[in-house]
Amino acid sequence: MKTDRLSSQSGTETQTTRLNTGSLLVSLSNKEKVEPLTSKVFSTPVGLLLIKANQYGLSHLSLVDVEEQEWINENHHSCREAAGFLSQTELEIGEYFSGTRVAFSVPLAPQGTEFQKQVWQALLELEHGEYCSYSDIAQKINRPKAVRAVGAANGANRIAIIIPCHRVIGKNGQLTGYAYGLEMKRQLLGLEGKADQKTILF
């Protein structure tokens, strides 16, 4: 069972809570059109992050620039039903960057094909600080010849950090491309304490 460590202060004593993260992906029909109901931009150590949610859970997390933030603020729509997912995401991301959270519990509701969701679920099952390659994921989902398709599904991930596509490295242990650049990838892996290791797990 994959676990989550969340530290909270109670007086001078630190309490640790471990949460199951094996079923974060909400089951949605591929034909079901789900539009984001609300969005928010907030600051993190790696830059401004845009998050979007629908009535089922978090649907988007990406890096944005200042111009995009201005457009988002002007076109913002709020929905109480989805707003709770944004608050939960901002809290958990903050804990992740402070080093007190090693996995996430916010429900995830991205749109994608069944194959893409299999790949994203395999990524979610990676432990904090754990590496894998496209080939490892293909083996994990019983599609050993679908390495390129796995790479495409990894690239189609729209919930960065939480669905940890940054943990995918080359089979030789070298860093491979990342949508937000190798420097951010190094930052995330360094935060997780594995940036200098060549560990392929699965």
Could you say what each language-model-derived stretch is?
Residues 145-189:
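Short glycine/serine-rich loop segments
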Residues 1-145, 191, 195-202:
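Basic nucleic-acid-binding alpha-helical/helix-turn surface characteristic of O6-alkylguanine DNA
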